[in-house]
Amino acid sequence: MENLVGLLRIHVKRGVNLAIRDISSSDPYIVVHCGKQKLKTRVVKHSVNPEWNDDLTLSVTDPNLPIKLTVYDYDLLSADDKMGEAEFHIGPFIEAIKFAHQLGPGLPNGTIIKKIEPSRKNCLSESSHIVLNQGKIVQNMFLRLQHVECGEVELQLEWIDVPGSRGI
């Protein structure tokens, strides 16, 4: 616990226009890596527009480590096919949380705390807003998959403070 900063809940919402890796569709799932941690979503059969709505929770010990996301096509009889990957950093999200704490309570629901634009330094496909949503600070993002012909993944990040951790 002494190295734990907090928990990051990644709500993997959906994939959009993912690559076809089987005859006419794919059976996608996502693997998320951060440091030595590895988490994965469930497989959604026969879809290039899967709705996962899976929550994956990472223990954050170093907020400077990138979070890597890889989409795979599940295959029963052979190795799973890679369908693209993306990477993001939680530094801007943590900065926004610190800023919101400095502002104190009383911010109205829906307040945009920070806006992050797509750039060559990130995998965002559109502006990403960090907002106050029902008392929680969340970041919504669409990530454009790299090393593949098409596809995006929609995520929502939520920070969870853990009593006894270093905190942010």
UniProtKB/Swiss-Prot annotation:
**What does the UniProt entry list as the effect of changing D27A?**
Impaired Ca(2+)-dependent phospholipids binding
Q: Which cofactor does it need?
A: Ca(2+)
What is the tissue specificity? Answer: Expressed in roots.
Q: Which residues bind Ca(2+) 2?
A: D22, D27, D73, Y74, D75
The compartments listed are: Cell membrane; Nucleus
Looking at the record, the residues that make up the C2 domain are 1-104
Q: Which PROSITE patterns match?
A: C2 (PS50004)
Indicate the principal place this protein occupies in or around the cell: membrane
Gene3D superfamilies in the record, alphabetically? C2 domain
Mind listing the UniProt keywords for this protein, alphabetically?
Answer: Abscisic acid signaling pathway, Acetylation, Calcium, Cell membrane, GTPase activation, Lipid-binding, Membrane, Metal-binding, Nucleus
Family, as annotated = Belongs to the plant CAR protein family.
Assembly behavior: Dimers and oligomers. Binds to PYR/PYL/RCAR abscisic acid intracellular receptors in an ABA-independent manner, both at the plasma membrane and in the nucleus. Interacts directly with PYR1, PYL1, PYL4, PYL6 and PYL8. Binds phospholipids in a Ca(2+)-dependent manner.
Q: What is this protein called?
A: Protein C2-DOMAIN ABA-RELATED 1
